[in-house]
């Protein structure tokens, strides 16, 4: 009986987690979370190759597309090739894509290894970073409830426009994102 209850609780938890993955209906939550922030929080962390990174990473690019994702999220994994194409395109304009795999916060080596394998399989090689879950940036990443979620950050670390909630494979989402990117690059 005890095993059955544990199994049912696990199944319910997974069902709730996967129902949030790619859910566009909860976009209001993101407007609230990101609207309260003027800039991406300061952080110190590492990329998936072990290189030290901090918020100055944004100063290296005219615009940075920051994508929040996790390994078990199908829409997140499905959009990795699209994000790689965006990264290639943005690099020509002085921009970049950076991934934040929320499962890898605190540097969980198993999750990072699995994420790297997923990215390799999907043909994605853009930079992914992690930092302490208890940092302000970690708290922001942990507040994301629907995945994937994508935001734009300018070279001063300011969050630009509204977050794009859900996969970028649809025309509407890409058009919205491209409009925001063009607006920043035009300034």
Where is each model-derived feature located?
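Aromatic-flanked redox-active Cys/Sec active sites in thiol-based oxidoreductases
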Residues: 67-73, 102
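A short beta-strand-turn-helix
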Residues: 42-64
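Structural microenvironment flanking redox-active thiols in thiol-disulfide oxidoreductases
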Residues: 78-121, 133-138
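N-proximal helix/coil linker or "cap" segments that precede and/or mark the start of modular domains
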Residues: 21-42, 59-60, 116-117
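C-terminal motif of bacterial Sec signal peptides marking the signal peptidase cleavage site
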Residues: 16-20
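Short, internal strand/loop/helix patches
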Residues: 114-151, 155, 164
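Thiol-/selenol-based redox modules, centered on thioredoxin-like
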Residues: 152-187
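Positively charged n-region of N-terminal signal peptides that target proteins for export
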Residues: 1-5
